[in-house]
Amino acid sequence: MRRILSVLLENESGALSRVIGLFSQRGYNIESLTVAPTDDPTLSRMTIQTVGDEKVLEQIEKQLHKLVDVLRVSELGQGAHVEREIMLVKIQASGYGREEVKRNTEIFRGQIIDVTPTLYTVQLAGTSDKLDAFLASLRDVAKIVEVARSGVVGLSRGDKIMR
């Protein structure tokens, strides 16, 4: 089962390692992890995407609440939410492949942010599925040389606020 946890925690040294320690102690892999300060520089928001057994994930979520640095934990998948990921991808193409890269970048609403005679660097934001679909659309027409992805970030929709 895929889970996305949003964790509001104090922006302090060691807070990240304590949260991540809960996952590593149980042998759970983190699919993606993003952490950054919020509009309040004393707080950070951590978004963790993981896949696993529901019982163990519930246990981890309960133990996250007990950590001193953690102020709030919310599972984004439990309600209406918005999630996004940013990807930078370096693509090698020539001839027809270059036209296909430009066309697919436009279709997926990405931006070409760097161009050389043999490479394009494309920036794309969206759901993980959208980014995966973009990569799949290029596999037959160009060579994907390098990929960097930010990991998922998300917020609840509507009036629900994490403070």
From Swiss-Prot:
Keywords: Amino-acid biosynthesis, Branched-chain amino acid biosynthesis, Transferase. PROSITE patterns: ACT. The keyword Ribosomal protein does not apply. Pathway: Amino-acid biosynthesis; L-isoleucine biosynthesis; L-isoleucine from 2-oxobutanoate: step 1/4; Amino-acid biosynthesis; L-valine biosynthesis; L-valine from pyruvate: step 1/4. Residues 4-78 form the ACT domain. The keyword Transferase applies. One of its GO terms (molecular function) is acetolactate synthase regulator activity. It catalyses: 2 pyruvate + H(+) = (2S)-2-acetolactate + CO2. Sensitive to valine inhibition. GO terms for cellular component: cytosol. Pfam families: ACT_AHAS_ss (PF22629), ALS_ss_C (PF10369). GO terms for biological process: isoleucine biosynthetic process; L-valine biosynthetic process. Its EC number is 2.2.1.6. Dimer of large and small chains. Belongs to the acetolactate synthase small subunit family. S.typhimurium contains genes for 3 AHAS isozymes: ilvBN, ilvGM and ilvIH. This is Acetolactate synthase isozyme 3 small subunit.
